[in-house]
């Protein structure tokens, strides 16, 4: 017999192309016309899609056709599942299935140009929008023109802060599925993880998001990677080694020091270090090795077995050789194990076919969840063996016994490299496939992992069967869609082999389902799940057109992009340093497939418990004309366990350290006799000895009795420094000819390109190419170029990143902090790299910037000359003070002597105000319904007192609609108990109605609340059948006049007739109810039972009084009238036309009840009357609520619990009718808690009324979700009001506003219906709290003392540098710390002193860097094993001046713990206290004065006066008298009276007025200004500064290096011989300037 089949995915997507399959297997005869339809569920009142197909010989009586399900009446409510009815109308029968639907329109993937951003930078994003079939979402892909025309393809893009405030939103229309956009981050932002949230405009409830990080950072110049020797630590292991690799981003190896610590991450995700594991590792040529020993663990955790299943982390901080930079890395997931492997039966079916092969597919992982490769596996019962492949899988076929009732599989692993024989095991149980005919089918695939283009060899083993020839159908499913189907006829053979190539549609994995049928009832099926190697459906590759090992900055290059013809390709080039900081948020092909695989409808590895289980587990609905069909899927997602992922974080704080020394007492004595430069007592020195009492005693005895002898050593000076012009200028390239590198984008090449279609002569080409020409940026790094394509035929493809190394043989790496605080001194480092094979001499120049005080200020540049070894790195430090807010460039140029090699770097330093970013958040819940329909909220600004003056501040405002509406929607009563109400009506006219009520109210309730799945979606057809039976049976008790009684012979009952009207009116939407049947009953009630005053009387009470509720109780006149009136009201929509007297009759009844209501005493009658009046629009809510319980949640009726239920239900209906949902909520909650009896509520009336009331409530609150919320935002000082309107269509979009200040009061007014949250986030800079120092962790003091005599043969002067450091912690000493000591230019360090400090028992420093002559370093690095927290540690050594330098810049000393790079910095200088650069300050406005002193001119010839007064840049010439002076340790201020303006300058009208002139304290002697004396002062415009003081603009004069100061003798002095010539010269000069001006 033929088998007719309807099959489709068991989760259908609305609005997308879906493949539906129909066939007739073993069909004999002519063509078949089949109509496929999709209708709404449960009523099937609307057709949502349809298509007709013809099954014939040509298509093998099979057809797979595409349908697009229209949205129609479907509502995408996340809390409510939606179903459709899928039908296939064959000529002789209808096949139908209820199918769950999804509103997933497709996929959106988001690429950002980077993974991490700084404030004020620009985020570039690219949106890729696709259909579920991975085609670009365009209108062209839909066959149906009407569908295509109406298809919404727009995508909304939102940028959300870590507080989930949307601060940017736009709607984009992707072109060919791709659209780029950008967003500039504000200057003041919240740090943390931000989100790009996208959604299809057609289904805004479904979001797709991508993340990026925002923080303040500087890109590192090298990366550190950690490779453990093993992925686990076995409890019996003695050690674990970790290889450290440090490599510059441009590929060269790093030399330096690594600080390593190991620890464990506990089960509570808490990190605990092993203090004993702290170690310093030498990194040479980019490599180092760290070692964790078992005793390191057991010193902290004696019972190592307690740590099993917890994971070890290793944290490494690598400091470059010259101390120029430190980079951190961490490796996690090294599990402590008793067995090294985990065994998962990941793709092994749960069911086997007795007597047929069974494929065991095991996945073996290391403890870090990575695949374990090459592990030997043994499987019992067969003792079959296998070995895991590169993906960690091993596939082992087992033979099964035909009589087996279960299959217990045990897998054991063996590690040949491990002496412990057995390393792990796992067990699973498989059950037999259920079949009534003993027919089986086994589908086997030869490979565990395939790639596109590979042939799949599919073995179909049918085993012994009595039917020799029959059709066998196979289907391929991937990504939740039917992809291809086929069929062949079996010709008696038991094994059939198919070979099908793997096509792109099957990525990333697919299922093969095969089946045949035996006779009418048995269908035999099997399936298998097959994984495909992660790859693109098509191809995309980026290569260099002319490949090279490395490229130079700014040079031209050419890329070839090859991929799928016609694809759109998005490009971006990213500095590899970005991924060193954050590689988490990159869009990769694996991430894409992971997302898509989540939407796979199949849930198991293959097979099934029985034939329909095979289809269901594979993700299919399957219905046939003979065999039973699949169950109905009710959950869109599979019950899968989540995959654990490895996380990477920065190093955590190390809390303690341990350091032990061993030595002989004799050595201790020798050490005690050594000289000590710190001047410590013997007792204090002995505190540094940790060799035990024996050593301490020996040390003290020798120290106190012996004198020491100084040992001096010689050291050559190679550091040469000049600030003046060099004699050998010709040997260097002029700095003006060096063009500095200044373009250092972290990403660029953000562009889209289209690959050409195939050429006409080769229309089926596999790929096409395009060439892009460009110029490299200025960075020395590795650029990673990522390309992502989207093709209409091959979907989305992320190419492997293409790397371009950019490098020069000699270059500068200028290290600047992310930001610097205005007026705070800091050190920046220029790192010189020499990658040539020769030693070089380099001239380095710091260029002047007027806004930054440095040694280059007022001189144009500051020069140094340094020697460099081959293949070496050199640090040149500079001390600067930024003077103004904003971005200011720091430029360093360098050229190699007698060579063309040179480089220049110009980077911007961000100068910020003093202050800390503060964030304050306020949330206001807007729910106007709870505030009488209108809500007003005031949010005062409250300007903080500590805000930094004139600094940026922002207020971000956002409004997000709540998921719920203003009313808390109560859950409907669970439908699971209603199954027992679906019964077949029987009995007399009254009993029949009792029973008919049950399926009617169950169907009414489950239809309204969409809860059919609680009792079974297929039960609705049964319920409808029973309602029809009840209806037909009741007609037998209908009298000719339309009335009803228990028997036709009995007198008609008013109540029963009214009840029939009520139930039939309710049924009329479910079955066909004749209008005259309903309306003649209504007419009978009006004509025969209603009295002139409107009351309805009962003349023949029903026999089954229990079915009427409390209608016969007190106030029964009102109860009966209300009951009949309600029945009429419910039937009025059907009967108004045919029963003319109906409106008048209802009006009379309403009038009677209105009059009667105030006098009623029975709560039951009040509730029922209230509902009848509510239907007429005349509810008196006050009266109704008066009879409620104190909690206002139910209406107690004396005499029966069922009456209370019924009365409460009528009250609920009345309140719902007038939309009083606030009051209705507690009532539903109360009803929900009441105990049901057999699915109902004890009596007919209480059951029908409770379910009717709750259904009515639910259907109304559903409509409440139509938001209608209006919000007005008023900002103080802003003329316009911002207005937002939230409705159902736009409720998922966030509204935002921004106020560029924090001193504006906000007023929010909300009206209408709905709930929303208003969030206000205020960001501003607060003044830091007063503190003596920025040093949070250390106290540091640096003093430089000149020695009486030199102690080095080349020294011009010798100094003792003393550094005292204390760790500011009350509990512990600092662990391994680094003291970075900058050296003054022209000075060398005394290495004998350093050797003494670092050797012997009493080591004050653990190590110092002296691989080369020390003066070749920019700084001296001292490594300290600890820093005391009780007593200041002192380190003293001599430094010698061996070279005279024109301008000597201060040097910096910094100290920090290796894991916390927040440094404590102090400066030193031979002449300046605190080593500060020279500045002159008035209030908070400062001027750089880093220059030589001006000398008072004495007896200068006239010509020099004229030259000076008329020279370039000279501003003024004054005769001035000093009237006052204020002298301080740093700045001297002279108040002078301007007696005569000889040459006027910028400062107008100054004659006769006082002005302040400022000079440096150490220039006091050179200036020689005395109070009461008069001077000629000439100054340049650059020494004149305009400042605001108390609101007044005034000029401040600086006595700088270029200022002319000459004593002006008094009249009396001019008569003396000493001054006569000077006075004549001055008179001549004044005459020349005032009469003739300056010579041209």
Swiss-Prot record:
GO cellular component, one term: extracellular space
Gene3D superfamilies assigned to the protein according to its UniProt record, in alphabetical order: 1.50.10.20, 2.20.130.20, 2.40.50.120, 2.60.120.1540, 2.60.40.1930, 2.60.40.1940, 6.20.50.160, Alpha-macroglobulin, receptor-binding domain
Gene (UniProt): c3
A single MF term (Gene Ontology): complement binding
Keywords assigned: Cleavage on pair of basic residues, Complement alternate pathway, Complement pathway, Disulfide bond, Glycoprotein, Immunity, Inflammatory response, Innate immunity, Secreted, Thioester bond
Subcellular localization(s) per the UniProt record: Secreted
Matches recorded under SMART domains: A2M, A2M_N_2, A2M_recep, ANATO, C345C, Thiol-ester_cl
Chain segments carrying region Properdin-binding: 1420-1430
Gene Ontology biological process terms in this record: complement activation, alternative pathway; complement activation, classical pathway; defense response to bacterium; inflammatory response
Subunit description: In absence of complement activation, the C3 precursor is first processed by the removal of 4 Arg residues, forming two chains, beta and alpha, linked by a disulfide bond.
InterPro entries hit by this protein: A-macroglobulin_rcpt-bd (IPR009048), A-macroglobulin_rcpt-bd_sf (IPR036595), A2M/Complement_sys (IPR050473), A2M_N_BRD (IPR011625), Alpha-macroglob_thiol-ester_cl (IPR047565), Alpha-macroglobulin_TED (IPR011626), Anaphylatoxin/fibulin (IPR000020), Anaphylatoxin_comp_syst (IPR018081)
Job description of the protein: Precursor of non-enzymatic components of the classical, alternative, lectin and GZMK complement pathways, which consist in a cascade of proteins that leads to phagocytosis and breakdown of pathogens and signaling that strengthens the adaptive immune system.
Superkingdom, taxonomy of origin: Eukaryota
Residue ranges constituting the Anaphylatoxin-like domain according to the UniProt record: 668-703
Name of the protein described by the UniProt record: Complement C3
Organism whose genome encodes this protein: Oncorhynchus mykiss (Rainbow trout)
Keyword Glycoprotein: yes
Disulfide bonds listed in the record: 536-797, 603-638, 668-695, 669-702, 682-703, 853-1488, 1079-1135, 1335-1464, 1481-1486, 1493-1563, 1510-1638, 1614-1623
Domain called NTR: residue spans: 1493-1638
Swiss-Prot/TrEMBL site (Cleavage) positions: 722-723, 931-932, 1278-1279, 1295-1296
């Amino acid at each position: 017999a033929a088998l007719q089949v309807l099959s489709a995915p068991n989760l259908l997507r609305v609005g997308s192309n879906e493949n539906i399959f129909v066939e007739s297997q073993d069909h004999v005869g002519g063509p078949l016309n089949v109509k496929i339809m999709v209708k709404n569920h449960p009523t099937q009142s609307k057709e949502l899609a349809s298509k007709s197909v013809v099954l014939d010989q040509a298509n093998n009586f099979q057809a797979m056709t595409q349908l697009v399900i229209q949205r129609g009446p479907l509502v995408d409510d996340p809390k409510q599942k939606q179903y459709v009815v899928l039908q296939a109308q064959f000529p002789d029968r209808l096949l139908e299935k209820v199918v769950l639907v999804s509103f997933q329109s497709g996929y959106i993937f988001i690429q950002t140009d980077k993974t991490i951003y700084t404030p004020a930078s620009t985020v570039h994003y690219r949106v890729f929008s696709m259909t579920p079939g991975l085609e670009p979402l365009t209108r062209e892909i839909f066959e149906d023109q009407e569908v295509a025309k109406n298809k919404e393809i727009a995508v909304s893009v939102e940028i959300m802060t870590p507080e989930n405030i949307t601060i940017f939103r736009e709607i984009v229309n992707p072109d060919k599925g791709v659209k780029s956009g950008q967003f500039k981050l504000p200057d003041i932002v919240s740090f943390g993880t931000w989100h790009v949230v996208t959604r299809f405009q057609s289904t805004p409830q479904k979001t797709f998001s991508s993340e990026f990080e925002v923080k303040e950072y500087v890109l590192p110049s090298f990366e550190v990677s950690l490779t453990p020797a093993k992925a686990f630590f076995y409890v019996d292991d003695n050690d674990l080694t970790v290889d450290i690799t440090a490599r510059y981003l441009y590929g060269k190896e790093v030399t330096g020091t690594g600080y390593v610590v190991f620890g464990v991450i506990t089960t509570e995700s808490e990190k605990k270090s092993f203090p004993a594991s702290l170690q310093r590792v030498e990194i040479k040529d980019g490599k180092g090795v760290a070692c964790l020993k078992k005793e390191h663990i057991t010193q902290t955790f004696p019972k190592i077995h307690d740590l099993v299943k917890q994971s070890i982390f290793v944290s490494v901080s690598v400091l470059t050789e010259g101390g120029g930079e430190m980079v951190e890395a961490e490796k996690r997931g090294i599990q402590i194990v008793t067995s090294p492997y985990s065994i998962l039966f990941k793709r092994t079916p749960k069911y086997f076919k007795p007597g047929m092969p069974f494929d065991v597919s095991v996945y073996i992982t290391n403890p870090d969840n990575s695949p374990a490769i090459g592990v030997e596996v043994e499987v019992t019962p067969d003792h079959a063996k296998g070995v895991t492949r590169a993906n960690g899988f091993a596939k082992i076929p087992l033979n099964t016994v035909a009589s087996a009732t279960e299959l217990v599989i045990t897998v054991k692993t063996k590690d040949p490299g491990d002496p412990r024989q057995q390393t792990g095991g796992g067990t699973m149980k498989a059950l037999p496939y259920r079949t009534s005919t003993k027919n089986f089918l086994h589908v086997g695939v030869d490979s565990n992992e395939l790639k596109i283009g590979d042939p799949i060899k599919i073995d179909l083993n049918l085993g012994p069967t009595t039917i020799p020839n029959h059709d066998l159908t196979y289907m391929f499913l991937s990504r939740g869609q039917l992809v291809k189907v086929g069929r062949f006829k079996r010709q008696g053979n038991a094994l059939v082999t198919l070979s099908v190539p793997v096509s792109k549609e099957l990525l990333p994995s697919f299922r093969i389902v095969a089946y045949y049928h035996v006779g009418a009832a048995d269908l035999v099926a099997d399936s298998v799940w097959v994984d495909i190697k992660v790859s693109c459906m098509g191809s995309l590759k980026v290569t260099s057109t002319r490949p090279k090992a490395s490229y130079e900055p700014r040079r031209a290059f050419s890329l070839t992009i090859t991929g799928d013809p016609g694809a759109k390709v998005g490009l971006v080039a990213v500095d590899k340093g970005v991924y060193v900081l954050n590689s988490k948020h990159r869009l990769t092909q694996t991430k894409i497939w992971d997302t898509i695989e989540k939407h796979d409808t199949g849930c198991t590895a293959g097979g099934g418990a029985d034939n329909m289980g095979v289809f269901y587990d594979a993700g299919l609905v399957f219905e046939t004309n003979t065999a039973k069909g699949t169950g109905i899927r009710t959950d869109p997602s599979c019950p899968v366990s989540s995959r654990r992922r490895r996380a990477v974080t920065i190093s955590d704080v190390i809390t303690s350290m341990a350091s032990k020394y061993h030595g002989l007492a004799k050595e201790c004595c020798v050490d005690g006799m050594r000289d000590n430069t710190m001047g410590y007592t013997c007792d204090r020195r002995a505190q540094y000895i940790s060799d035990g009492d024996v050593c301490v005693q020996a040390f003290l005895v020798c120290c106190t009795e012996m004198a020491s002898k100084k040992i001096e050593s010689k050291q050559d000076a190679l550091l040469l420094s000049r600030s003046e012009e060099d004699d050998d200028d010709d040997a260097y390239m002029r700095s003006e000819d060096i063009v500095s590198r200044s373009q250092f984008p972290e990403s660029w090449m953000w562009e889209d390109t289209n690959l050409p279609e195939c050429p006409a002569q080769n229309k089926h080409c596999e790929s096409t190419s395009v060439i892009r020409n460009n110029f490299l940026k200025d960075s020395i790094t590795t650029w990673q170029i990522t390309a992502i394509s989207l093709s209409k035929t091959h979907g989305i493809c992320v190419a492997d990143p293409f790397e371009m190394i950019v490098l020069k043989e000699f270059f500068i790496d200028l290290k600047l902090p992310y930001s610097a605080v205005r007026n705070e001194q800091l050190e920046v480092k220029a790192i010189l790299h020499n990658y040539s094979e020769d030693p070089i001499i380099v001239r380095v120049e710091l260029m002047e910037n007027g806004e930054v005080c440095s040694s280059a200020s007022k001189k144009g540049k500051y020069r140094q000359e340094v020697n460099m070894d081959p293949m070496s790195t050199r640090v040149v430090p500079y001390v600067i003070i930024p003077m103004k807010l904003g971005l200011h460039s720091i430029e360093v140029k360098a050229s190699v002597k007698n060579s063309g090699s040179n480089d220049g770097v110009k980077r911007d330093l961000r100068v910020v105000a003093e202050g800390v970013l503060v964030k304050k958040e306020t949330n206001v819940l807007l729910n106007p319904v709870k505030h009488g329909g209108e809500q007003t909220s005031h949010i005062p600004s409250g300007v903080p007192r500590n805000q930094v003056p004139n600094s940026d501040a922002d207020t971000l405002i956002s409004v997000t609609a709540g998921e719920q509406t203003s009313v808390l929607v109560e859950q409907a009563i669970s439908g699971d108990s209603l199954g027992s109400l679906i019964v077949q009506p029987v009995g007399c006219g009254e009993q029949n109605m009792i029973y008919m009520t049950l399926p009617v109210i169950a169907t009414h309730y489950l239809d309204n609340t969409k809860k059919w799945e609680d009792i079974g979606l297929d039960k609705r057809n049964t319920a409808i059948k029973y309602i029809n039976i009840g209806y037909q049976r009741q007609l037998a008790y209908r009298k000719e006049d339309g009335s009803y009684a228990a028997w036709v012979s009995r007198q008609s009952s008013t109540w029963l007739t009214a009840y029939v009207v009520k139930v039939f009116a309710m049924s009329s939407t479910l079955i066909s109810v004749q209008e005259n049947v309903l309306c003649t009953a209504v007419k009978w009630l009006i004509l025969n039972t209603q009295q002139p005053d409107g009351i309805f009387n009962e003349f023949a009470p029903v026999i089954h009084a229990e079915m009427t509720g409390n209608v016969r109780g007190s106030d029964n006149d009102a109860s009966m009238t209300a009951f009949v009136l309600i029945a009429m009201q419910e039937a009025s929509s059907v009967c108004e036309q045919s029963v003319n007297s109906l409106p008048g009759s209802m009006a009379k009844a309403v009038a009677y009840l209105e009059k009667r209501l105030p006098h009623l005493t029975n709560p039951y009658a009040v509730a029922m009357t209230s509902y009848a009046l509510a239907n007429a629009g005349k509810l008196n809510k006050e009266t109704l609520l008066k009879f409620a319980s104190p909690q206002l949640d139910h209406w107690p009726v004396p005499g029966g619990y069922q009456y209370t239920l019924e009365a409460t239900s009528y009250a609920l209906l009345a309140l719902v009718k007038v939309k009083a949902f606030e009051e209705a909520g507690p009532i539903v909650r109360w009803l929900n808690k009441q105990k049901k009896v057999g699915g109902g509520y004890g009596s007919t009336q209480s059951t029908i009324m409770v379910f009717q009331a709750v259904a009515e409530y639910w259907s109304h609150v559903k409509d409440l979700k139509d938001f209608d919320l209006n919000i007005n935002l008023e900002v103080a000082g802003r003329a316009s009001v911002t207005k937002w309107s939230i409705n159902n269509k736009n409720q998922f979009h966030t509204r935002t506003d921004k106020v560029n200040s924090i001193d504006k009061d906000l007023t929010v007014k909300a009206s209408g219906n709905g709930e929303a949250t208003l969030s206000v986030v205020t960001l501003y800079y607060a003044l830091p709290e007063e503190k003596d120092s920025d040093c949070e962790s250390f106290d540091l003091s640096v003093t430089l003392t000149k020695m009486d005599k030199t102690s080095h043969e080349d020294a011009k002067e010798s100094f003792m540098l003393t550094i005292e450091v204390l760790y500011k912690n009350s509990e512990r000493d600092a662990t391994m710390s680094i003291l970075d000591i900058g050296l003054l230019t022209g000075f060398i360090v005394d290495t004998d002193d350093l050797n003494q400090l670092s050797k012997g028992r009493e080591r004050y420093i653990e190590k110092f860097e002296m691989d080369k002559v020390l003066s070749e370093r920019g700084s001296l690095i001292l490594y300290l094993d600890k820093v005391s927290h009780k007593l200041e540690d002192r380190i003293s050594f001599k430094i010698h001046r061996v070279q005279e330098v024109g301008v000597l810049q201060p040097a910096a000393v910094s100290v920090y713990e290796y894991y916390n790079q927040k440094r404590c910095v102090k400066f030193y200088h031979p002449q300046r206290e605190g080593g500060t650069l020279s500045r002159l300050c008035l209030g908070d406005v400062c001027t750089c004065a880093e220059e030589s002193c001006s000398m008072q001119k004495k007896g200068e010839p006239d010509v020099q006066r004229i030259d000076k007064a008329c020279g370039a840049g000279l501003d003024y010439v004054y005769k001035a008298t000093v009237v006052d002076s204020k002298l301080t340790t740093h700045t001297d201020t002279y108040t002078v009276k301007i007696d005569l303006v000889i040459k006027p300058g910028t400062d107008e009208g100054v004659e006769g007025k006082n002005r302040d002139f400022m000079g440096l304290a150490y220039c006091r002697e050179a200036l020689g200004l005395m109070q009461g004396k008069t001077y000629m002062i000439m100054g340049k415009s650059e020494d004149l500064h305009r400042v605001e003081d108390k609101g007044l603009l005034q000029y401040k004069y600086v006595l700088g290096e270029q200022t002319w100061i000459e004593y002006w003798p008094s009249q009396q002095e001019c008569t003396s011989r000493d001054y006569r010539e000077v006075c004549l010269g001055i008179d001549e000069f004044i005459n020349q300037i005032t009469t003739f001006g300056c010579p041209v």
